[in-house]
Each structure stands twice: as C-alpha cells, then as structure tokens.
C-alpha cells in the first residue's frame, strides 16, 4: 500500500449538485427557486420571512413599554471619584457636582442628573451634590468626613421650575 493509492470510501464524499444545467439534470430551468418574481432573483432576503411559517417576531407576545418621562441618570462609583481626586482632576476642597464631574472627565455628560453608587473605597473628604445616591455611598462619604446633598432631578424643558 502506498500513500498515492489511498482513496476515500465509496459514497463518503458526495459531489455537489450543479443547478441550472438543463432540465434533464432535475435541477435545471428554475434551479430550485420556483417560478418567477422577486424570490427567483439573486440577493433576495425578506427579513423575518420563514417560508410561510409564522415568524418568530409574530409568535412571541408583545411585552412592556417605553416610559417617555423616565429619567436617565449618569452613574458614578466611589472608586472612580477617588481616582479623580488622586490624579488631581477633582479639587477636594470644592463642591463636587455634575458640572465638576464632566469637567474632570469622570463623566462624558450628566444626562438627567448624576447618581452616586457605593462601589469602592473613598478616603477623600468631599462635599458632593448629586441627584441621587445609594445608602452605602452616602454612608461611605460621611465616614470619610464629607457630605452628600441630594438635589431635585433636572426639570424638563418648558416646565416651571
């Protein structure tokens, strides 16, 4: 037996069917695409169409809604604040508010307000003004000798403030 004499078992590799090669081949004329029309052409994909079967997006029930009045807060953790103080981006002597956080590069933008979260350690004494804070965050700031003032959420434009 030589390497050049090795062959596959009979029927283990089936040749692919070449379509559109005459009606005698059994896959000629329309080439398995049915009649004429949009789906007989190349590049056709009807999004969500599953061959007449009820598509998934219609089988599943509708659920929930989007509240147009929901407020979206930018979130800041204590460890991120401590990093900013350590790198001198935030002055510990001044009031830390949304504008100061954006200016320091801690936040990209303040959205509808800022919410303080309690992840990490805070050793700097900071006076913080935010629109929301967790109990653990408030406790950590006060333990470090600082204070947290909770502001009212930003009023909607056109609303009397």
From Swiss-Prot:
Gene it is expressed from: rplO
Higher taxonomy: Bacteria, Pseudomonadati, Pseudomonadota, Alphaproteobacteria, Hyphomicrobiales
Known function: Binds to the 23S rRNA.
MF GO annotations: rRNA binding; structural constituent of ribosome
Entry's Gene Ontology cellular component terms: cytosolic large ribosomal subunit
InterPro entries: Ribosomal_uL15, Ribosomal_uL15/eL18, Ribosomal_uL15/eL18_sf, Ribosomal_uL15_bac-type, Ribosomal_uL15_CS
Subunit and interaction comment: Part of the 50S ribosomal subunit.
Gly residues compositional bias, start-end: 21-37
Protein name per its UniProtKB record: Large ribosomal subunit protein uL15
